[in-house]
Curated annotation (Swiss-Prot):
Residue numbers annotated as active site: 2, 604
Domain Glutamine amidotransferase type-2: 2-219
Family annotation (Pfam families): GATase_6, SIS
Protein's name in the database: Glutamine--fructose-6-phosphate aminotransferase [isomerizing]
GO biological process, one term: UDP-N-acetylglucosamine metabolic process
Protein role: Catalyzes the first step in hexosamine metabolism, converting fructose-6P into glucosamine-6P using glutamine as a nitrogen source.
Gene: glmS
Origin species: Buchnera aphidicola subsp. Acyrthosiphon pisum (strain APS)
Catalytic function, reaction form: D-fructose 6-phosphate + L-glutamine = D-glucosamine 6-phosphate + L-glutamate
Domain (SIS) ranges: 288-428, 460-599
Keywords noted in UniProt: Aminotransferase, Cytoplasm, Glutamine amidotransferase, Repeat, Transferase
Gene Ontology cellular-component annotations: cytosol
Length: 609
């Protein structure tokens, strides 16, 4: 969500700060700003609504000379989108940027008004700035003590960076819930929400942990934990190449990431398939087999696209490994009383590993008596990975487009590998495990085949781009793929789309069918094909128009349009049929001229509940 970049250096940093938040645009935002303490010890602040390019224009009109400062992209949660609500916020000598939500904002605001503070915005961030200033004036303590005292009064999740004009040689960072990292330089140091903002200047990072406060100067860093004790945090060297954060020959990151899926899946499979057609996850270490041997039930918790991946895997766990599996949306999981089954393994699923609802669910689950918790994630350095008992990495590589593509298909790949691993661990049905391994081995080639069909899918997208509503249908493990197709279309084209199991058509959605609502059906050749054919006839008999993704021809009605795809093995069909739906959503959004990589109101990493 919001993006933070800060630096303390020997050079002028205004342009560096803007470059940093420019690299965080993919996180989603509606306004941006920066504040620098210049060489005359004045605070220079520039804020604007809209794209970072607007901030660049305003900054270029001023020659800002200063070596310490902070920049921010805002995604509105408290207060409308306006210049007044845009960060940084200032209270006399205190500069603050913040990501998160302060839940007792109203109470603190009322208290501070009684102390004589005047508010110029509706944000909870300005509350933090005034609270810090009040604490500083009251006790005359050092800024670190002021922050330690102030955060005790804050309810909610946050990451913040603070600069004191009276001590303009240090940045102070505090983290509770939302991610924050320190980038290590040579006689200069940096802070950011995400390493992508800093990869062009350093590959050395320290990840702040829950409750940490850090004092960051040019040559020195001191970190205090939640008990206010000085602590050393591990330095991590990033393996992400800066060039991977560029679009290359592609117009949008989403297009690039769709085409990277064969490579991403190969990376996900690499060193995990043994010569004996078994699965090995090196991340799990020596406990690898014991974890799964004792598992008698699986509970998966996720949000958004990750939830759809989890829904597919439920079919796999139950049909292939004979293990009961339940899937729940993370925000719902944390808000109700749960009955935990015996020997139940909790699995959390997240691309970023910083999804607030999923993190909250993981923390809640630790009180409930699960056998253990396993996270499947794309970011090794994430909070979810650090707080879980075990983790498996998807190895999708850097994903910048807000709409997930390769992270979804690599999640599905890992989940299917996990099914095979559980079968191996229980020493049951070894033929099924071998079949999974052998089928996954050819998946990248199958996806390369379907990417060659993109012109056919673009033609379909151009035909349907002016529609206001669409209906997606699928049966069995293709129903969650229909859900994912509808979600992708909504996210980037802003066309309303719904997904239903094909068998539910006559239980309500059939009332919507007419020539103006296209029906997108996923109907591969499998045991459910004949049932899908009956649904297609139902739609056509009511004047509906159907677009069918299948390896079979459907030419018995003039209202049927078949997007003929290559045959694919049933085990990997859900992953395979995801690709044309991603392409379809992309080309519809392209035709409509949408901002595909940064769709309105959405964020790549949802770090608030």
């Amino acid at each position: 969500m919001c993006g933070i970049v800060a630096a303390v250096t020997q050079r002028n940093i205004a342009n560096f700060l803007i470059d940093g938040i420019k690299k965080l645009e993919y996180r989603g935002y509606d306004s941006s700003g920066l504040a620098v303490i210049d060489n005359k010890n004045n605070i220079v602040r520039i804020r604007c609504v809209g794209k970072v390019n607007e901030l660049i224009k305003k900054t270029n009109k001023k020659k800002i000379l200063g070596s310490i400062g902070v920049a921010h992209t805002r995604w509105a949660t408290h207060g409308k989108v306006s210049k007044e609500n845009t960060h940084p916020h200032i209270s006399s000598n205190i500069i603050v940027v913040h990501n998160g939500i302060i839940e007792n904002n109203s109470t603190l605001r009322g208290f501070l008004k009684k102390q004589g503070y005047i508010f110029s915005s509706d944000t909870d961030t300005e509350v933090i700035a005034h609270l810090l200033h009040w604490e500083q004036n009251k006790k005359k303590d050092s800024l670190i003590k002021v922050i330690q005292n102030s955060i005790k009064k804050l309810d909610g999740n946050y990451s913040m960076v603070v600069i004191d004009q009276n001590n303009p040689s240090k940045l102070i960072a505090a983290r509770s819930g939302s991610p924050l990292i320190i980038g290590l330089g040579t006689e200069e140091n940096f802070i950011a929400s995400d390493q992508i903002a800093l990869l062009h200047v350093t590959k050395r990072f320290i990840y702040l942990e829950e409750g940490d406060i850090a004092i960051v100067a040019r040559k020195e860093i001191n970190i205090f934990n939640k008990n206010n004790s000085i602590i050393q945090r591990e330095e991590v060297v990033s393996n992400i190449e800066y060039k991977s954060a560029k679009k290359g020959k592609y117009r949008y990151y989403m297009e690039k990431e769709i085409h990277e899926q064969p490579k991403s899946i190969r990376n996900t499979l690499k060193n995990r398939l043994t010569n004996s057609n078994k699965v090995h996850f090196s991340e799990l270490g020596s406990k690898e087999n014991n974890i799964f041997y004792n598992t008698e039930h699986i509970q998966i918790v996720a949000c958004g696209t990750s939830y759809n991946a989890a829904m597919v895997s439920r079919y796999w766990f139950e049909e292939l490994a004979n293990i009961p599996c339940d899937v729940e949306i993370a925000s719902e999981f944390s808000s109700r009383k749960l009955v935990v089954r015996k020997k139940s393994l909790l699995i959390t699923l997240s691309q970023s590993g910083e999804t607030a609802d999923t993190l909250s669910a993981l923390r809640y689950s630790k009180k409930l008596g699960y056998l253990g918790n396993l996270t499947i994630c794309n970011m090794k350095s994430s909070s979810l990975v650090r707080e879980s008992d075990f983790y498996i990495l998807t190895k999708a590589g850097l994903e910048i487009g807000v709409a997930s593509t390769k992270s979804f298909t690599t999640q599905l790949t890992v989940l299917l590998l996990l099914v095979a691993k559980i079968i191996n661990s229980k020493k049951e049905n070894n033929n099924t495990s071998k079949r999974i391994v052998q089928t996954l081995s050819i998946l990248p080639v199958r996806i390369e085949e379907i990417l060659k069909k993109k012109q056919l899918i673009q033609d379909m997208a151009n035909t349907l781009a002016n529609k206001k509503n669409m209906l997606f249908l699928g049966r069995g493990n293709q129903y969650p793929i229909a859900m994912e197709g509808a979600l992708k279309l909504k996210e980037i084209s802003y066309i309303h789309a719904e997904a239903y199991p094909s068998g539910e058509l006559k239980h309500g959605p059939l009332a919507l069918i007419d020539k103006n609502i296209p029906v997108i059906m996923i109907a591969p050749e499998n045991s459910l094909l004949e049932k899908n054919k009956k649904n297609i006839k139902e739609i056509c008999s009511r004047g509906g128009i159907v677009y069918v993704f299948s390896n079979q021809e459907f030419d018995y009605e003039e209202n049927i349009n078949t997007i003929k795809l290559p045959y694919v093995e049933e085990l990997i069909a859900p992953i395979f049929y995801t690709i044309p739906l991603q392409l379809f959503a992309y080309y519809v959004a392209l035709k409509k001229g949408r901002d595909i990589d940064q769709p309105r109101h959405l964020a790549k990493s949802v770090t608030v509940e």
